[in-house]
Swiss-Prot record:
Gene3D superfamilies reported for this sequence: 3.30.1370.120, 3.30.1370.130
GO molecular function: DNA binding
Protein name: DNA utilization protein HofQ
Keywords: Cell outer membrane, Membrane, Signal, Transport
One matching Pfam family: Secretin_N
Length: 412
């Protein structure tokens, strides 16, 4: 193909001020890329270094474009890369650059491999050495090693000085105390009137106003259960600034509530804490044709699992899992009887302030009470004593409520 070298025209647009960027008109047809780059470099009085792998031709027609834009257009069309240091312009291909980077990395790796190895021991104050070692192994050099001393919670390192310094800085950033949350809970059965006295009123709040003090968001619908005396839903509310312990004790003395349990737990950031209250019910399990039986157990417990997440500005996010498992019906089978367990489980996530109390409710029970009041002696007289006796029945509806108060524990 005929090359029109003479058609390579680089013409400066006369400028009024020297500060203005120079513009060029470039018209080339099937001209070697190296020659076009040489002409552009001479225009700016730059020294040009072209790598041996720069080849090929280019055809361009540019009119009155800035010199830098013209250079970028030529380089981009040829698939090249430029680098300017002072008045030296270097041009090479992408493949050459990748090979050069790989060669430099290989030389650095060889240099690292020849460095002398040193031993170092890092004692961790807060983090678990075993967990930290899993992530820290990636920072070791090819000849480096890391050993965990579980007894003293130390990392035993052997590597070159550069790698050890990087590891020490990384460990210092990771070995920080995690937030601790104290969880105070009260699991009670209470009637509706006493619940209102505590300032809790189950209401359906919209998303914008959910979680206000004394207001409760209904998070779930009723769950079906086997017994007719248990009704399950799920409500959640907040109580601020209350002496909850004293008020619950006072209501218990008035026989207006029963405190089932008052556990206190200490949980770390993102670590679950759980409490269970109940019993394990044994039942026999047949092993098939052999006829042998073994005893296994089913849990009939009230359980609560809380996983706290420590947030900014004294706020805590709680992931809650509450379960109420009670003995159900006795099922008849060919090899005997099996006790069913009625399960109600609720899982939710809420965000509260430190010291704010959550009220979790929605599991209802009914108690049918019957009693007799009579006048002493006279009430015991047959037939005639009915005039001096009073038979009464009371249908009491109580709700199982869990009050839980998370508080941030200072690490100082």
């Amino acid at each position: 193909m005929k090359q029109w070298i003479a058609a390579l025209l680089l013409m400066l647009i006369p400028g009024v001020q020297a500060a203005k960027p120079q513009k060029v008109t470039l018209m080339v047809d099937d001209v070697p890329v190296a020659q076009v780059l040489q002409a552009l470099a001479e225009q700016e009085k730059l020294n040009l270094v072209v790598s041996p792998d720069v080849s090929g031709t280019v055809s361009l027609h540019l009119t009155d474009v800035p010199w830098k834009q013209a250079l970028q257009t030529v380089v981009k069309s040829a698939g090249l890369i430029t680098r300017q240091e002072g008045n030296i312009l270097s041009v090479h291909s992408i493949a050459w650059q990748n090979n050069n980077i790989a060669r430099q990395e290989a030389e650095q790796a060889r240099a690292q491999a020849n460095l002398p190895l040193e031993n170092r021991s890092i004692t961790l104050q807060y983090a678990d050495a075993g967990e930290l070692a899993k992530a820290g192994e990636k920072l070791l050099s090819a000849k480096g090693s890391m050993t965990v001393d579980k007894r003293t919670n130390r990392l035993l390192l052997r590597d070159n000085k550069t790698a050890l310094s990087a590891l020490e800085q990384w460990v210092a950033q990771m070995d920080l105390p995690v937030g601790q949350v104290e969880l105070s809970a009260h699991i009670v059965t209470i009637n509706e009137k006493s619940l209102r006295e505590l300032g809790v009123k189950w209401t359906l709040a919209d998303a914008q106003h959910a979680g206000g003090v004394g207001q409760v968001t209904t998070l779930g619908s009723d769950l079906s259960v086997a017994t007719a005396t248990t009704h399950v839903g799920f409500n959640i509310g907040r109580i601020n600034g209350r002496l909850l312990d004293l008020e619950l004790s006072a209501l218990e003395q008035k026989q207006q509530l029963d405190i089932i349990a008052s556990p206190r737990l200490l949980a770390s950031h993102l670590q679950p804490a759980s409490i269970k209250q109940g019993s394990e019910i044994p039942y026999q399990v047949s092993s098939g044709e052999s006829g042998a039986t073994s005893v296994e157990f089913k849990e009939a417990v009230l359980g609560m699992e809380v996983t706290p997440t420590v947030l900014q500005k004294g706020r805590i996010r709680l992931k809650l899992h509450i379960s109420q498992n009670v003995p159900g019906q006795v099922l008849q089978q060919a090899d005997g009887e099996v006790l069913a367990i009625d399960k109600q489980e609720i899982e939710t996530q809420v965000e509260v302030k430190s010291g704010e109390t959550l009220a979790l409710g929605g599991i209802f029970t009914r108690k049918n009470k019957s009693g007799q009041d009579s006048v002493p002696l006279l009430g015991d007289i047959p037939w005639f004593g009915q005039l001096f006796r009073h038979d009464g029945k009371e249908d009491e509806r109580r709700e199982l409520v869990v009050f839980i108060t998370p508080r941030l524990v200072s690490s100082e």
